[in-house]
């Protein structure tokens, strides 16, 4: 953060606009209710949450920071209500028809950030579900990186930015759980990228 007051004002105004954009149930999406949880909806919601959460880190105003976190939590809660395990919920890797769900699975990072800030177990539980889901409907990218047997060009999903984004979330998951396997998985992937 540069400490530039004009930049802070722009970020603050943007955070306020995002907070105001939330629907009554907390949803912030460019997709209609009929088409949500498809296409790039989850990817866009990820960045709604990350934008708000990154702003919380630099916010000078306690009340605004609390509202930004609350808004990010409510957005996450709309996802938790519709996506996951259980009757009537959509599998995370099925919330997009492209790239086998890796873009959707990358919500792991903001979900973990919310968990780190709140300590609310439901977010860690949802993150555990994402990790168990493997990040993709055609390959468990986390397990494959842990086993370290495949070169990246042999992965079934070759969407580099989204895969890296999933692993950023996996590292946050490791930070919360201490499960060494996931740290090793991320290190293996990083080594393969070099």
PLM feature spans:
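Glycan-recognition and catalytic cores of secretory/periplasmic carbohydrate-active enzymes
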Residues: 1-194
């Amino acid at each position: 953060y540069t400490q530039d007051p004009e930049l802070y004002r722009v970020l603050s105004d943007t955070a306020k606009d995002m907070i105001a954009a939330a629907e009554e149930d907390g949803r912030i999406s460019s997709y209609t209710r009929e088409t949500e949880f498809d296409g790039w909806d989850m990817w866009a919601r990820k960045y709604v949450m990350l934008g708000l959460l990154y702003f919380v880190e630099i916010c000078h105003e306690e009340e605004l920071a609390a509202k930004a976190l609350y808004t990010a939590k409510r957005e996450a809660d709309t996802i938790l209500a519709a996506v996951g395990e259980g009757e009537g919920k959509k599998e995370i890797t099925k919330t997009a028809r492209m790239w086998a769900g890796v873009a959707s699975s990358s919500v792991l990072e903001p979900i973990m950030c919310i968990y780190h800030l709140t300590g609310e177990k439901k977010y860690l539980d949802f993150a555990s579900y994402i990790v168990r889901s493997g990040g993709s409907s055609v390959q468990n990218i986390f397990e494959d990186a842990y086993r370290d047997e495949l070169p990246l060009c042999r992965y079934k999903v070759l969407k580099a930015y989204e895969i890296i984004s999933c692993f950023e979330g996996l590292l946050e998951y490791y930070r919360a759980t201490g499960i060494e396997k996931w740290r090793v998985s991320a290190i293996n992937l990083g080594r393969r990228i070099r």
